[in-house]
């Protein structure tokens, strides 16, 4: 959809090769994360990925990998009937946010994305959002407004994701925010979330951001919109082991120690 910060845009001609993970490859990766204490398993797809195929994959994961983990999807637009079906088939939550400068730095219709959020909120699914992708171009007011709108939607998981410059995209020459700025934003979001926001997520995670109030971080692999290349290993060398270590360094207790 040619978002100005995303490596996936056809217009930018950055991604040259097609990669499709088999169900077996996905199951193997999920199993590693679950066995090492991952609480959420997020399946991120391209905008128009087949929902029936995704449901089939979710059911395979639930059948073959035991555990108390929760499955979250980051997918395209859908209606209430689909939301209810996803829940019935084992999905716990949906990541679907209105990004900063949606419709300007992206080519998505804000109203369409809001409609999908409403479908999630009217179903048993849990809505997950982040203030993202935060860059030096965004004002305090934009960031605060995005977060407060998310809070009004009773999102259990909120937080912030920094924009990672990808050369070749329109925003690729704009520097990223500093780790200090990201930590500051996380601290403000934690204090402002009150008793509504259960978890504060930060991505990419830093120790300062974790110490500032984030308690959820992301380990990702595969097609990453913040990278010009396919990522067969954990992106930016953030592994499930290093995630545990980072959280433990900030005095959080996790299921495993490394």
Task: State where each predicted segment sits.
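Core AdoMet radical
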Residues: 10-25, 33-53, 57-58, 62-120, ...
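Conserved C-terminal portion of the radical SAM core fold
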Residues: 43, 93, 108-171, 186-200
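A general structural detector for well-ordered alpha-helical segments in enzyme core domains, enriched
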Residues: 26-29, 54-61, 82, 112-119, ...
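Local cysteine-cluster metal-coordination motifs and their immediate loop/turn environment
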Residues: 1-11
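Auxiliary Fe-S-binding modules of radical SAM enzymes
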Residues: 151-258
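Generic structural signal for helix capping and beta-alpha/helix-loop junctions
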Residues: 50, 103, 137, 167, ...
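Catalytic cores of alpha/beta
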Residues: 79-88, 135-151, 203-213
């Amino acid at each position: 959809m040619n978002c100005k910060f995303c490596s996936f845009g056809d217009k930018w001609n950055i991604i040259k090769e097609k990669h499709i993970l088999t169900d077996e490859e996905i199951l193997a990766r999920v199993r590693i994360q679950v066995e090492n204490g991952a609480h959420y398993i997020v399946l991120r797809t391209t905008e128009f990925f087949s929902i029936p195929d995704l449901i089939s994959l979710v059911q395979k994961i639930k059948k073959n990998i035991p555990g108390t983990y929760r499955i979250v999807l980051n997918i395209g637009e859908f209606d209430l009937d689909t939301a209810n079906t996803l829940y019935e088939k084992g999905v716990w939550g949906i990541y679907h946010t209105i990004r900063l400068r949606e419709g300007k730095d992206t080519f998505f219709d804000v109203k369409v994305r809001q409609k999908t959020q409403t479908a999630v909120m009217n179903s048993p699914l849990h809505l997950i959002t982040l203030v993202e992708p935060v860059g030096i171009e965004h004002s305090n007011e934009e960031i605060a407004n995005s977060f407060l709108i998310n809070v009004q939607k009773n999102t259990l998981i909120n937080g912030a994701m920094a924009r990672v410059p990808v050369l070749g995209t329109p925003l690729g020459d704009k520097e990223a925010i500093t780790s200090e700025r990201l930590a500051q934003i996380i601290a403000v979001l934690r204090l402002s979330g009150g008793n509504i926001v259960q978890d504060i997520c930060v991505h990419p995670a830093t120790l300062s951001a974790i110490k500032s109030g984030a308690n959820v971080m992301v380990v990702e692999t595969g097609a990453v919109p913040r990278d010009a290349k396919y990522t067969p290993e954990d992106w930016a060398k953030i592994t499930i082991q290093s995630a545990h270590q980072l959280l433990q360094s900030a005095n959080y207790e996790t299921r495993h120690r490394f």
